[in-house]
């Protein structure tokens, strides 16, 4: 089922197991994983919807992500993020929510319209479901924190989640940067090393957990990220909506 088309790029929902295998293969490559199946797959693939962005000229899958919908926060403990974060603060959330995960783009693709197509599709989904909160895990490549100290310092200073929504520590290995990091931020360096997807979320008013999880399986550090739709700056929202 087609969601949206931007130029030569089309976003659609996966409609077969073959589609899901294609997404898992792209994720495997993008995330630099290593296993005999050459797929990035887990149990959540069976319960999520998969959004595929294809180049209609080459008929090639170039970007994908998956979503999991919630009517409210009551069942947020069944989300992927809840494996790593204590999300009890969000259980009383009354509005519809969507978890977004496994976002990746083919490394050979440099056209910014691909990301715009992905966001236009997500905007369509959010609007149709009257979603108020998008959430997920935003990853930093690798598990060595030193490269990202300025980025974490910037998150600490400007983007920590409000108290009533803030996830608590659950994972065994974390970097509690809000407490343990005594570091004066170099903003230029912080933005340079900040993951591009997280930068996009932050520009739309997103907030993050006060700690990062060390994910040895994916070989990443990640922070819980929440974005309240009603708080997205109008200029940013219009940029995406104009594509739909």
Located regions from the model:
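Short amphipathic alpha-helix that is part of the acyltransferase structural core
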Residues: 1-63
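Conserved donor-binding loop and adjoining core beta-sheet/short helix segment
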Residues: 7, 38-42, 52-92, 96-105, ...
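Long, contiguous binding/interaction regions
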Residues: 233, 237
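C-terminal "cap" of GNAT-fold acetyltransferases
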Residues: 219-231
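Generic recognition of flexible, low-complexity loop/linker segments
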Residues: 40, 211-212
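Acyl-donor binding region in acyl/amide transferases
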Residues: 73-206, 212-213, 218-220
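Short intrinsically disordered coil segments
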Residues: 82, 238-244
């Amino acid at each position: 089922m087609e969601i949206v088309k931007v130029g030569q790029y089309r976003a659609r929902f996966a409609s077969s197991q073959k589609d899901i295998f294609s997404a898992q293969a792209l994720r495997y490559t993008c995330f630099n994983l290593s296993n005999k199946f050459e797929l990035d797959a887990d149990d959540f693939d069976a319960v999520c919807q998969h959004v595929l962005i294809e180049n209609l000229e080459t008929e090639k899958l170039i970007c994908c992500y998956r979503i999991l919908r919630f009517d409210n926060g009551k069942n947020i403990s069944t989300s992927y993020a809840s494996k790593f974060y204590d999300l009890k603060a969000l259980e009383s959330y009354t509005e519809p929510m969507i978890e977004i995960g496994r976002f990746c783009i083919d490394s050979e693709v440099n056209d910014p319209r691909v990301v715009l197509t992905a966001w236009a599709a997500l905007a369509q989904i959010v609007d149709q479901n009257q979603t108020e909160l998008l959430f997920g895990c935003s990853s930093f490549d690798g598990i060595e924190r030193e490269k990202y100290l300025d980025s974490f310092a910037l998150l600490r200073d400007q983007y920590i989640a409000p108290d009533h929504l803030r996830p608590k520590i659950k994972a065994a290995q974390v970097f509690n940067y809000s407490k343990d990091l005594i570091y004066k931020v170099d903003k230029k360096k912080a933005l340079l090393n900040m993951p591009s997807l997280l930068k996009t979320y932050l520009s739309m008013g997103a907030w993050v957990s006060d700690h990062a999880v060390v994910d040895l399986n994916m070989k990443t550090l990640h922070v819980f990220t929440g974005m309240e739709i009603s708080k997205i700056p109008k200029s940013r929202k219009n940029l995406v909506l104009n594509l739909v």
